[in-house]
Amino acid sequence: CGELNILPTAKTPLNQYHSYTGTDSMIMPHTKLQIAPGIRLPTNNPKFLYTTGTLTQSNYIQKSAGQQAEYDHVFSVLYIEIDDDGDWFPYHLSAESDTGCFYHLNKYYTPKGCDGKFHRLAGLNPGDIHEDKLKMPIRKMMWLDDDSLVQTLKPEVVMANDTYDHGRRNSHNVDDPYHMYRAYVKGKECVKEEVAGSVDTLREITDTGSKVVVVESNHDLQVERWLRTANYKTDPVNAVFFLELQLCNYQRMSRGEKLHTFRSACEIVNGGELDNVRFLTTDESFMVAGIQCGMHGDKGINGARGSVPSLAKLGVKTNTGHIHSAYVFNGAWAAGALMTQQDSGYAKGLTTWSITHIGTYSNGKRVMFICKKNKWQPRYDV
């Protein structure tokens, strides 16, 4: 959409253009770096709205609007690569303001060209995992295959959001007889089995050489809610694990320790602590290259629900999850999910969900990986 001429001082340049290109994605020339998820039918391909960033030096009138715009002035381009299947993959190439150098995947480019070295990602925020809904093609694309995202870019740390789903005994559907019968027919009633699946997934990721940091998320916390509200006497499939985990929580409280129920569940299943895995508690900070990655994104300001625009007010750059949609608003970035809306089993109607992930480079610059047809990068016929 090169014909657009949006004022560089516009705070939300994409807001009025969601329907401008119909069902197609759009690219808007603008000095800010933003990505907005496009609204679509669940059966349609994901749609995204992008701004480009700019290559020009800032030159704003030093009054309120100009001073705010100068703060969000980003040296960046949107690079598009189209593979042999006709699928297009966008990457923001964000330059260091003092050198003009930038990262792309595992390479670092200077005014003299690529430096020829392999550069690991400092961090990767995959979309929310929801292990019990995670399909094998996505698992292979993300970390199992030799050319998977994790094995190719070798992030030092992988931030795991909503590792667990708890769809088998979720408080939102446990009183729904149809849902419970479907779970019975599919053999998906055992909570311990679902936790074991999450443990296996964490092991799969650490086997690649990356450290995993589990961000305490709303679906992980459903395990604790289950212990608070469920009646094990009417749930024989889960009674033993329920009581084992309940005893663990009461023992922790007796010692004056903070509850960390999902971690406890994983360690019971694993028979001890998981190697190279760290579990964060709610509100615990974890920084990656100057970016706050310790929040899931579900909790906002003063008890309100979390949102990407509200996190942008924090004064610290953030990487979060929760909304299952690729969203970039200035310094606040949110990743998507590792499942589609159709696979969730609970979300219906129009959607912005996407299989998208945030990569963080060692200089604090970031890139959003947009996955298509079980591909995280372009694929070419050799």
What is each PLM-predicted segment?
Residues 135-257:
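Core catalytic region of metal-dependent phosphoesterases/phosphodiesterases
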Residues 27-28, 49-51, 89-92, 157-161, ...:
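A structural signal for short, well-ordered beta-strand segments and their strand-loop junctions
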Residues 105-139:
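Mobile, glycine- and charge-enriched loop segments
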Residues 126-129, 163, 301-305:
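Short, flexible loop motifs at catalytic/binding sites
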Residues 5-86, 288-370, 374:
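Conserved beta-sheet core of the metallophosphoesterase superfamily
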Residues 70, 230-292:
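Active-site-proximal loop/helix segment associated with metal-binding centers of metalloenzymes
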Residues 84-119, 364-382:
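A short C-terminal boundary segment appended to hydrolase-like catalytic domains
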Residues 80, 128, 158, 162-163, ...:
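Divalent metal-coordination and catalytic microenvironments
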